Amino acid sequence: ARSRYTYFASVAKKEGFEQIAAVFMETAEQEKEHAKRFFKFLEGGMVEITASYPAGIISTTKENLAAAAAGENEEWSDLYPESAKVADEEGFPEVAVAFRMIAKVEAEHEKRYRTLLARVEAEKVFERDEEILWQCRNCGFVLSAKKAPLKCPACLHPQAYFEPMKQNY
């Protein structure tokens, strides 16, 4: 998923969705950490892994969001619960816990992708029904409006750089 998401981020950026590109990249980094967690359970030597992998295609941001959401859904609803069950049956409770905890993250990834997909479909990525705070991802300029400006009044970057302001401090 990590590599696929980095490709999807490039498409989103080209299509003028800087925030969506950033979400794809953030998720790609989280997927890297999931892989690292699972990799640490391997104890060296040769390991035979039999699995199928969704090759998919790189398409539009809309289609990429839909594909990403579907993939995350499969991970949290089927793949990881089944893997946790097998780990429990084979006497690896710590591995089972990791699968269950990471499945919770994958459910959040799906939720985020579906929310962004709905906004792309409704053409509401840069517009809301009520006033919100919009922040320029480039320079930090903030304004209250229903719609992000076509161009940042401070740094002149295009609308693509605006996202709803979030405060995580």
Where are these regions (language model features)?
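Non-heme di-metal
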Residues: A1-Y169
